Curated annotation (Swiss-Prot):
NCBIfam families xref list: murE, PRK00139.1-2, PRK00139.1-4
UniProt-recorded name of the protein: UDP-N-acetylmuramoyl-L-alanyl-D-glutamate--2,6-diaminopimelate ligase
Keywords: ATP-binding, Cell cycle, Cell division, Cell shape, Cell wall biogenesis/degradation, Cytoplasm, Ligase, Magnesium, Nucleotide-binding, Peptidoglycan synthesis
Motif (Meso-diaminopimelate recognition motif): 411-414
Catalytic activity: UDP-N-acetyl-alpha-D-muramoyl-L-alanyl-D-glutamate + meso-2,6-diaminopimelate + ATP = UDP-N-acetyl-alpha-D-muramoyl-L-alanyl-gamma-D-glutamyl-meso-2,6-diaminopimelate + ADP + phosphate + H(+)
Enzyme Commission numbers on file: 6.3.2.13
Subcellular localization(s) per the UniProt record: Cytoplasm
Matching Gene3D superfamilies: Mur ligase, C-terminal domain, Mur-like, catalytic domain, MurE/MurF, N-terminal domain
Gene this protein is translated from: murE
Source organism of this protein record: Pseudomonas putida (strain ATCC 47054 / DSM 6125 / CFBP 8728 / NCIMB 11950 / KT2440)
């Protein structure tokens, strides 16, 4: 068990007990722990200092600004100005600076983070470098993920997880880095080696307020002092701006950091794909690089997944793998759970479950699946409650324009009235009377699949891998994959 004298973390502490663990949650405190009491969006940890002490905390560090009366105790209570901003550094020191001992890949962007990190991790495993994962689907190693609630965990959990992965044999970690995490300093003390940008489109404006603020949060990762390489998408406006910013830097910066770009459209990119042939089995494309032309093969569906694959290939090049070595493993790489995941097909409808919950992501999924729909292309979607209301009609516009039939249902209503969410979505349709609105996601999925033809393709968008539905603040067991499997099994009987 790791322990550290308190003085190694706070030199001015009144006493110097051995610290066994760090925690932000008073309920998880055990004897010997350091409780870090900070104000949060919903709960102020400083109000729970007494609880932490009762549970055996060896010391408490708390945010000094705005602190109220503290309990009387012999346990060290350490006031710290700006504690939240220092959490990542404190945890890094406690856990032995694990990011310095790993090839740390940070992937950011509106869509594609999960796919790219999983592709990178699978490829590195196949190439002999064990790679850990931190992201939307959880933390751990590929195929053995422990689920979590946040794309990027809190600053303590991030450092602790990196340390656990290192001890578990990881030499690299592919990590999703959300705009929230960058803005809130959750990864502030990490030493990223590679920064990857997938794309930028409308999302999280309920938090950031504007696209400019959202972009500024994402851009922070590409100014990281420890970077060896930036990987950017030239098919995206933000990616082109990052590349232009890099080109304007003093040449001395380019000695320490290089830039690799990828594109399906621009021959100027470091990795440029042309002559892509898409089929039900995936894609075969010509890859144009400074090393000459190669053939890239992938089993993933869709043009946007080819872009994700290019991001992964560029990342592996940044980690000094040879291109020919990389291209030997790309045909083996699989997509993540709930990302363009296929069920059915053959003599029954093809159902595709995808996490697409932004207008841009939904557009890419529907465009990718249109060639596979030999009948009609059907789309089911909803919009999450307590999130950006402005994107709701935009989702409707995309679905109506690209699908033959649209059904709107609940996503995660959270604390919002589902009917109000429907009301926000409806104005995005030019022909709302042609659209089905069905409350109850399970019922909606069953209805859409039951009424589909065998040669139709059905997109269930928005929830992907999620195994719950959040209603009135409570998470209920629910899975699009499970509901689709049940509906496909029921579909066989009347059509047999």
């Amino acid at each position: 068990m790791m322990t550290m004298p308190l003085s190694k973390l706070f030199a001015h502490a009144s006493r110097d007990p051995l610290i066994r663990e760090l925690t932000l949650d008073s309920r998880s405190v055990r004897p010997g722990d350091l409780f870090l009491a900070v104000p949060g969006a919903k709960v102020d940890g400083r109000e729970h200092i007494a609880d932490a002490l009762a549970r055996g905390a060896a010391a408490v560090a708390y945010e000094e600004q705005g602190a109220n009366v503290l309990p009387l105790t012999d346990v060290p209570l350490i006031p710290v100005k700006g504690l939240i901003a220092q959490l990542s550094d404190i945890a890094g020191r406690f856990y032995g600076e694990p990011s310095r001992q790993l090839n740390l890949v940070g992937v950011t962007g509106t869509n594609g983070k999960t796919s790219v990190t999983q592709l990178v991790a699978q490829a590195l495993d196949l190439l002999g470098q064990r790679c850990g994962l931190i992201g939307t689907l959880g933390t751990g190693f590929y195929g053995e993920l422990q689920s979590g609630r946040l794309t990027t965990p809190d600053p303590i959990a991030v450092q602790s997880t990196l340390n656990d992965l290192k001890k578990g044999g990881a030499r690299a970690v592919a990590m999703e880095v959300s705009s929230h995490a960058l803005e809130q300093g959750r990864v502030a003390a990490l030493e990223f080696d590679i920064a990857v940008m997938t794309n930028l489109s409308r999302d999280h404006l309920d938090y950031h307020g504007s696209m400019e603020a959202y972009e500024a949060a994402k851009a922070k990762l590409f100014a990281w002092p420890s970077l060896r390489c930036q990987v950017v998408n030239l098919d995206d406006d933000f990616g082109r701006r990052l590349a232009a910013d890099f080109a304007r830097r003093p040449s001395v910066d380019h000695i320490e950091t290089r830039l690799l770009s990828y594109s399906l459209e621009s021959p100027e990119a470091s990795l440029f794909c042309r002559e892509a042939v898409f089929s039900d089995d995936g894609v075969r494309a010509t890859l144009v690089t400074a090393q000459g032309e190669r053939i890239l093969r992938s089993q993933l569906l869709g043009r946007f997944n080819l872009s994700n694959m290019l991001a992964a290939v560029a990342t592996l090049l940044a980690l000094d793998y040879a291109l020919d070595e990389i291209l030997k493993v790309t045909p083996q790489l699989q997509g993540p759970v709930g990302r363009m995941q296929r069920l059915g097909g053959g003599d029954k409808p093809l159902v595709v479950v995808d996490y697409a919950h932004t207008p841009d992501a939904l557009e890419k999924v529907l465009e990718a699946l249109r060639p596979h729909a030999h009948g009609k292309l059907l789309c089911l979607f909803g919009c999450g409650g307590d999130r950006d209301r402005g994107k709701r009609p935009l989702m409707a516009e995309v679905a109506e324009r690209l699908a033959d039939r649209v059904l709107v249902t609940d996503d995660n209503p959270r604390t919002e009235d589902p009917s109000r969410i429907f009301d926000d979505i409806r104005p995005g349709f030019t022909r709302p009377d042609d659209v089905e609105f069905v409350a109850g996601r399970g019922e909606a999925i069953a209805h859409l699949i039951a009424t589909a033809a065998a040669n139709d393709v059905i997109v269930l968008a928005g929830k992907g891998h999620e195994d719950y539905q959040e209603i009135n603040g409570e998470r209920h067991d629910f899975s699009d994959l499970t509901e689709a499997e049940k509906a496909l099994a029921a579909w066989e009987a009347p059509h047999a």
